[in-house]
Every structure is written in structure tokens, then in C-alpha cells.
Design a protein with these regions (language model features):
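Hydrophobic, membrane-inserted alpha-helices
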Residues: 11-15, 160-164, 183-190, 206-211, ...
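Small-residue-enriched transmembrane helix-hairpin modules in multi-pass membrane proteins
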Residues: 137-145, 235-354
Length: 428
């Protein structure tokens, strides 16, 4: 094991141990982002696959620029909020459970959301004539299950699941309504599994986890590791559904990934490669890139909503996945920034993200509301998958954010004032 891996795993262990301090916030920006990236780099530097290569100095520098810029943003937010009284998490839980909701509005918003999802599902199915789960192993792909406009609305499951949890949390009684909402939400979620999509479900899970952590006593530090492993297992399970011969899957991955360890541990191949190849692809690509795309990827939602994405891509012959040496085709969030704007984008955009996310965190801790917790929960998801993709650029992500914003704005009763509770809490 290299000194880089030892250092990164040591940072991960330190973050975990600090989470057991009293009033320590396990979801603070520095902890979430630091843990995810320390783990990713530590695993990548083990070089357990022959597809991995020794990173160039340029690759290391550019990767660390992105990480350091984000952490610099969080540090500035910390300095700006020094001395500011933060509501302890125990007091936050009391305040958040006291929020008032217009029950009928939230109920019907969820029902309408399920209706929109159902109509979109049926329209695309009738247009295509197949479901992704039933065409695995063929030339058809899950990304082909799409009709312009309806393809975005099909991703409503994230806000449907979250708002159903909010309904259960804030609405007292109403057992029949809760059973009905839970039933239609589970049906929608079950049908969504057939599409072999994962990010929308992971988004719902992480935002729900954040809400339950800050608003209830259900989530404790000792449970977080099991939840993290559960989420990772879900990623792996969705990946396995794309193949017919599951009994040969582990050995297939082991062979194609050219792993260096014994075949007895072949089942570890896909989780490991899923985590590290994003960084490998980024480091390999940045040293070969000789042109930039000036916002095409960072602001992907703009070209998507206007219908220009395919036209612009074809006109300029943009290769969305260049310089690959394997079937793993993602590059981490930093790739979008570098490919669009070079080193300047890699320094500036993560800095703005780190600063913005951290300022949102301190706003949530000083003025705890369901809206603020929800907004920060979405950003926890962004940090959690930053080693993989940059979800903010996706149209489906912005659609879910708008749905959450308008749903909560319409259903929650506004509070006129908030009382600062308790002493200054642990900030990082």
C-alpha cells in the first residue's frame, strides 16, 4: 500500500472518529466532501487493476486543484461564520418537527406528481414498446428509453419519494392518506426500478437521509457506515441487472478489468472499479485534451431544454467520452469544468460550489427550516456523487429541484421568526 493510500485512509478514519464527538455534525460539507474524495483517491492509488496507470504530475496537480478549490470555498465560509450561533442538532430536531404544513396541498402535490410520472411512463412505453429491464444484453440501451419532454418528467420519483417522507414526518394522524401515498409511491418506485436508473433513487435516498438526520433521532453516527455500504450495494445491484448471466458476472468483470488480486475476491471488482475509474479517466483525459467546449457540459441543462444538445454536438463533432481505455465512461465532476474552461474553470467553479454549499449549510444551522434542510440535502447528494458526475448540469436534476421548491413553498406554512437556541455548535 502506497503512502498516498495510507494518508487518504487515515483521513477517512479521522473523519469517522470525529463524527462520534458530541454535537458533531456528520453531514457538514468538509466531512462529506473530504470523506468521499479521500476514499476515492485512496482506493485509486492501490492500483488493483491493470487498466489503471501511474498518474502524471499534471494529472495529480489538476485533480488536487479541483479538490483544494472546493475545500478553500468551505474554509472561507467557515471564517465568515466564526462566532455565529448555530442551533444544536438536538434543538434543530425540535424546531423542524414543529413546522406546520397544509396537509391537503402536500397530499395533492404528491398525487399530481405520481400522475405526471405515470403518464410519462406510459407515453414513452407506448412510443418505444419495451422496458430497459427486458432488453438487457441486446443492442437497445436504457438511454434509448426516452421521448423529448416526457423523458424529463419520467424522473419525478426523487421528489415524490422525498415529499412522501415529509408528509409522514409533519402530518399527524391521517392514516388512510398516509397508506394511500405510501402505496402509490412504492408502486412508482417499483416501476422505476424497471428502467435500470439509479441516480434519481440515490438522490431521493440521500435527501431523505439528510432530512431524517436533522429532523429526527432515527439516524445515528454508528448507522451511517451501514447506510453508506447499502447505497454502494444498490449501485452495484443496478449495474448487475444490465446483464443476463448473473452467475458469470463477477468473473466477467474480474477478467475485463484485469484485476491483480485473486479470483476468489472477484465480487469486489465492480465496486472497486466503479469508484476509481472516474478518477483514472479524468487524469488520463486532462493530459490529452487539446481544446475546450466553453460551457457545453457544465451548462448541459440549457442545451438540453432548448433541444440544441444533439445539434451542437454533431455540428462541432463533440466526443462526449474521449480517451477511454475501458467500458467505464465517467470522469468525475471536475472533468466537466476542465473540459469547458481549462484550469481556470477547475479552480473557480469548485471554489464557488464549496463556498455556496457551505454558506447554505450555515444558513440551515442558524435558521433551521424544512426548506433549508431540503436544499442542503440536495447539495449533500451533489458532494456524494462528485467523484462520479456533476448532477447539477442535468435537466432531470433541475426539474426535481424546482418540484421540491414549489412543493414545499406551496405546502409549508411560513414562520415569522426563529429563535436562536443553545450555544455555538460544532461547525466542522
Amino acid at each position: 500500500m502506497s503512502w498516498v493510500s495510507l494518508l487518504c485512509f487515515g483521513i477517512c478514519l479521522g473523519i469517522v472518529l470525529f463524527c462520534f464527538r458530541r454535537e458533531a455534525d456528520i453531514l457538514s460539507p468538509g466531512r462529506v466532501f473530504g470523506f468521499v474524495w479521500s476514499l476515492a483517491i485512496g482506493l485509486a492509488d492501490l492500483k488493483l487493476s491493470r487498466l489503471q496507470q501511474t498518474w502524471s504530475l499534471e494529472g495529480w496537480v489538476l485533480l488536487l486543484i479541483g479538490i483544494s478549490s472546493f475545500l478553500a470555498g468551505t474554509s472561507i465560509a467557515y471564517v465568515l461564520n466564526l462566532g455565529k450561533k448555530l442551533v444544536p442538532i438536538s434543538a434543530m430536531r425540535r424546531l423542524l418537527r414543529q413546522e406546520e404544513v397544509v396537509e391537503r396541498r402536500l397530499f395533492w402535490f404528491i398525487v399530481v406528481g405520481v400522475g405526471i410520472y405515470t403518464v410519462s411512463y406510459l407515453v414513452i412505453f407506448l412510443a418505444k414498446g419495451w422496458l430497459p429491464v427486458f432488453v438487457v444484453g441486446t443492442r437497445l440501451s436504457r438511454v434509448d428509453f426516452y421521448v423529448f419532454g416526457f423523458g424529463v418528467l419520467l424522473n419525478s420519483t426523487a421528489f415524490i419519494v422525498f415529499l412522501t417522507v415529509v408528509y409522514h414526518l409533519l402530518v399527524h394522524g391521517r392514516r388512510a392518506e398516509k397508506i394511500f401515498l405510501t402505496s402509490i409511491t412504492l408502486i412508482a418506485l417499483g416501476s422505476y426500478f424497471l428502467l435500470l436508473q439509479r441516480f434519481q433513487i440515490i438522490m431521493a435516498a440521500i435527501v431523505c437521509f439528510t432530512l431524517l438526520y436533522y429532523a429526527t433521532s432515527y439516524i445515528k453516527p454508528r448507522n451511517v457506515l451501514f447506510i453508506f455500504l447499502g447505497v454502494s450495494a444498490f449501485f452495484y445491484w443496478i449495474s448487475t441487472l444490465r446483464y443476463r448471466h448473473l452467475e458469470l458476472l463477477s468473473m466477467y468483470f474480474y477478467s475485463t478489468a484485469k484485476m491483480k488480486f485473486s479470483a476468489a475476491y472477484a465480487f469486489l471488482t465492480e465496486p472497486y472499479m466503479y469508484m476509481v475509474m472516474n478518477l483514472e479517466n479524468f487524469v488520463r483525459a486532462v493530459s490529452r485534451l487539446d481544446h475546450h467546449t466553453y460551457g457545453y457540459f457544465t451548462f448541459d441543462f440549457l442545451v438540453s431544454v432548448t433541444g440544441l444538445e444533439k445539434w451542437v454536438g454533431q455540428y462541432f463533432a463533440i466526443d462526449r467520452m474521449p480517451y477511454l481505455n475501458s467500458g467505464y465512461n465517467t470522469y468525475s465532476a471536475f472533468w466537466d469544468f476542465y473540459r469547458d474552461f481549462g484550469a481556470a474553470g477547475l479552480a473557480l467553479i469548485p471554489f464557488v460550489l464549496g463556498l455556496g454549499i457551505s454558506l447554505l449549510y450555515y444558513r440551515m444551522r442558524s435558521t433551521p427550516t424544512i426548506k433549508n434542510v431540503t436544499a442542503y440535502g440536495v447539495m449533500v447528494f451533489v458532494m456524494f456523487v462528485s467523484f462520479f458526475v456533476f448532477p447539477i448540469s442535468f435537466l432531470w436534476f433541475l426539474y426535481n429541484m424546482l418540484a421540491l421548491y414549489w412543493g414545499l413553498r406551496w405546502a409549508l406554512r411560513p414562520r415569522n421568526s426563529y429563535v436562536q437556541v443553545g450555544p455555538i455548535a460544532e461547525q466542522h
